[in-house]
Amino acid sequence: MRKGDILTHSFRPFPNNPSTAGGEVRKAVIDARERGIVFDIGHGMGSFAFKTAKVMLANGFLPDCISSDVHALCIDGPAFDLLTTMSKFLCLGMKLTDVVRAATETPARALRRENLSSLRPGSVGEASILALEQGTFDYVDSTGEHLAGGQRLTAAGVVINGSWWNG
């Protein structure tokens, strides 16, 4: 892989996960990041594990991009949607600003579409308005492991072409 290439399903369970049994990030993964490889979550049916994510985050290896790989087999779980995937990372300890950046600005930059992640004059002017809810929420990963979380992101509105959309 070359600088700027995107590796999706990067926090997957065994086999081929990015961490060792000893709780470290594999050297090849660290080397890939140093070469400029972009690490994307792509949470779908079989491609995301809390165990892997906990090891990666504990080692300071945050995902560059948080995305979902939602299709017919996982729309009813475990991935559900992008906001659920983002919420899982909040509950794993990532800061809200880092989670939002990894789902917006960084993917847009990786795709060379920076105008999609900006609200500056002259940009596309589209945004999802999110709410952060407190409560008790049950999250599940691709292996069936559960994580109790105290927060979740929900959709509160949409701005399209600079105007509030009323659907």
Locations of the language-model features?
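Active-site core of metal-dependent hydrolases
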Residues: 1-76
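A general structural signal for short secondary-structure boundary/capping elements
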Residues: 28-34, 87-91, 133-136
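Solvent-exposed alpha-helices and their adjacent loops that cap or buttress functional pockets
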Residues: 1, 31-33, 120-121, 148-152
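Short, solvent-exposed coil/turn elements at secondary-structure transition points
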Residues: 13, 45, 105, 133, ...
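C-terminal cap of metal-dependent C-N hydrolases
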Residues: 124-167
